[in-house]
Amino acid sequence: MDATSCMKSLLLAVAQYKTCKSDSNGGVLHRQLEVIIGLNLNRLFASNQILPSECLSSLIELLEDPNTSPAITLKTINLISSLAADSETGETLHATYNLTNVLAGLVHRYSSIINDPVLLQSIQLLQRLTYNVRVLHASINIEELIAFLMNRIQAPEDKLTMPCLGLMANLCRHNLSVQAHVKSLNKVKGFYRTLISFLAHTCLTVVVFALSVLASLTLNEEVGEKLFHSRNIHQTFQLIFNILVNGDGTLTRKYTVDLLMDLLKNPKIADYLTRYEHFNSCLHQVLGLLHGKDADSASKVLELLLAFCSVTSLRCILRQAVFDQAGKPGAGSGRLGPGTKSSEPAVSLVHWSSQSLEAPQNCALLALELFKEVFEDAIDAGSCQSAERFVDLLLPVILEQLQIPDHELDEALAKKRCERVAKALDVLIILCGEDVLKFRVTRILVVNRFVSMVDYQFSCSGVDTSTKMVDSEFFKTSTDVILKSLDLMSRIKQLVTNMEAAFYKILQDHRLITPLSFALTSKNRERVHAGLRILFEAAPLPGFPSLVLGESIAANNAYIQQETDCPPKRFAVQVTSNNCKTPQSSNIQSIDNSSTKMQDLILKLQTGMEIKDQANDVRISDIMDVYEQKLSALASKESRLQDLLEAKALALSQADRLIAQYRCQRAQAEAEARKLAALLKDTERRNEELSLLLKSQQIESERAKSDIEQLFQHSKKLQAVADEHEKLKISYADHLIKYELCEKQYKELQASYNLLTKQAETMKKLNDSLKVQNEQTIAQLNEVENQHKDLTKQLQDRDGKITNLQQKLKLLEEKIKTKQKEKEDMEETIDILRKELSKTEQARKELSIKASSLEVQKTQLEARLEEKEAVVKLQQEELNKHSHMIAMIHSLSGGKLNTENVNLSL
């Protein structure tokens, strides 16, 4: 079955289960859920299509229904967990379907059943959904969820403790409302004590979760100041870096990076980290994680390195670790123990920056951003020589990023490509800030690449149609690419052949007006600066359309004002120019015709004003005011009509789509009904045939039963005979085995006896030597007593020092007590071992007795065998005598029988 039919079957099964929650309906729904899980439809559910949305809504309703069976609930949670593995689907489930509150209610319902798998799966799914997501504590079931999590964390440790800690860390991170709610509870001090006790846990993931919750709740309070004080912060850093390098997996590494990034936002802790003596070795271990790790771990490590770059002194150390000390022997060795093998960090960064567009993580963007930071620091510090060899490695990767794709990309991949190109251009712009690096960059850049790239961005961003959406993220990234490309061209126009002519040609292109006006009216500071630099270059040119730029800026400002006044409405701002292409829509053509008529009226009025005398200026100005009011009214009417037309067109397209979907669904349902009717007829015909076969087989089975009973009685008799034979064989084999075992045990015991006698002799020798040593020690003790008398005098002088050391002695006494307890435990174990040794000696004695008895039995059996052999010999001799006598008798009787033919057995 295809995905569409499977989802329809799922919707039908859910509807049937809602109407009647019977076992049969539950079984059908369970099978449909397993089918959907097996198909792996994550991308289909991530789309905004109607059928997957209905399926998700029905699944959420199943979780909300308290009468849903636990088996169906668990299977539904498994399906949603597999779908939530995709980040876009997870965000949709949280934001659109309110799954977080539904799962919180589910946890509240199952909170009394601790060992239920539904509770564990729900908490794990909540942990995945709430990662890097802010949840309002005033939402439904969230306060109950927080109370449950705190109770479970403070309860004895079980399998729920770790996911509860992770979920609590997600809820408290960057969420002031949840933090305030937790701090307002009465049992928060006990909760803090429990979290602090978890810092000594053997599982590194539990330690990270507990430390993350403590950092979120207590970082700016008295408890946090004690916990992250300068006396303890170095141990905390060592613990965090240890977990980061030697963590249990990607999940632990994610939370460790988030924790360290949150701590770096505190200026005191950032200052402590700059003074941390082992930061260099820890940084090399962290850079080593970029080599040979998965994309998830690499992206989190890159985020951490970018967070280090936010601190000036740490950025300098990071630059030295990446460039200056790369490849040095021992660069990756630190105090962290068995870390990962570290290749040159810059080579690993080049590898991650060349990641493909289809990769799920944004490692390429982060790696390029990190290159930008370290290159900028190298240029500022005047140490570009260390970075030169890595520039040659990076430039081919950047050129590959700037290439135009061969095929058309979808919107998500196109936006991702634009972001990556923008980051690559940032790196090139930074490299052009130093002459040597700038020369290396200009050696590989050509004009055609920039011209084709700017043309491609003009075409794919919709600038050719002179219409843009101000709130479109793709348009913003395309604008950034165009502006940064022109900024880079302006920096290298004197060093690359034909670059200057191409640069000024693009500046005079009317398509540049839309992105330039957007940049000048943007809220982003860097975008405004880039737009101003380009404007200063373009303004003196004769072909630059400055009037159109002014109109575009005014239109953007009007749109921004309208958006601030009416934020829910989002319309497109249209900029018309004389060089624009004519649109194809009839509605837009009418609007363009009316706008041209207005332009003609304005021109006529202007020419009329030039012909008229100055005496009629007042009247003409009044007429102009009237016309301006009419023009503004017409413009507002046109915008409203355009909005209505767009809304109606959208509604009509949605209605057509719904009608088409309904017709398709109806046709598919009718086809399925026909198939089911045909299947039902076939099954009825098969049932009749099978009933006839069943009757004939019943008759044959009755005959077979009688034959089987006769054979069974005969087999019983044979089985009894076989059982007796087998018993005799088994008893004979058992006796042989026992005899062989006894012989082996006797030999082993004899060998052990010999060893024990040797050990006894050695113990006697040791005893004699110990006596001699004892006499020597007595003599030494006498000497020590004399020394002791001398030392007592010295001890009287040191009584003052002893009073200061008494506190330390108390601690040592406690340790001694623990050692004494351990000693007592060891003595108990020694007593137990002695008892076991005595038992083994008794067993040895019993075995020796058994061995002696077996030897006696053996001698008796040998004597009996000798007697029986003697008797057999005597009988044989008597038989021989009898045979001779019979032969003599036959010979005397006439020799009719030969002696050879005599039957001796008689």
Curated annotation (Swiss-Prot):
UniProt entry keywords in alphabetical sequence: Chromosome, Coiled coil, Cytoplasm, DNA damage
MF (Gene Ontology): protein phosphatase inhibitor activity
Keyword GTP-binding among record annotations: no
Localization (cell): Cytoplasm; Chromosome
Main subcellular location of this protein, as a coarse class: cytoplasm
Nuclear export signal, short sequence motif: residues: 599-613
Pfam family of the protein (one): CIP2A_N
Ranges in coiled-coil conformation: 626-884
Superkingdom to which the source organism belongs: Eukaryota
Gene Ontology process terms (BP): chromosome organization; DNA damage response
GO cellular component: chromosome; cytoplasm
Subunit structure: Homodimer. Interacts with topbp1; forming the CIP2A-TOPBP1 complex.
PANTHER family: PROTEIN CIP2A (PTHR23161:SF2)
Function description: Acts as an inhibitor of protein phosphatase PP2A. Together with topbp1, plays an essential role in the response to genome instability generated by the presence of acentric chromosome fragments derived from shattered chromosomes within micronuclei. The CIP2A-TOPBP1 complex tethers chromosome fragments during mitosis to ensure clustered segregation of the fragments to a single daughter cell nucleus, facilitating re-ligation with limited chromosome scattering and loss.
Family statement drawn from the similarity comment of this UniProt entry: Belongs to the CIP2A family.
Protein name: Protein CIP2A homolog L
Natural source organism: Xenopus laevis
